[in-house]
């Protein structure tokens, strides 16, 4: 299971109201969905080859593997708590 990722920021983009970054971690590219606040900060900074470290929640579904990235462990834990509520995230 992936718990956190640290690596070079390659790109960031949005698709269908979802925000993503691509992180190069020792030659592997990880596509991670991120919060809007972090996306806006990256957009404002506009630095390439910036080192990014994120806490990761890996969700495995029948048809996909999803990585959700957070800038703090507290954000990640809050996300996990929300997912435990019946009907949320299904």
What are these model-predicted stretches?
Residues 1-84:
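Structure-specific DNA junction-binding interface
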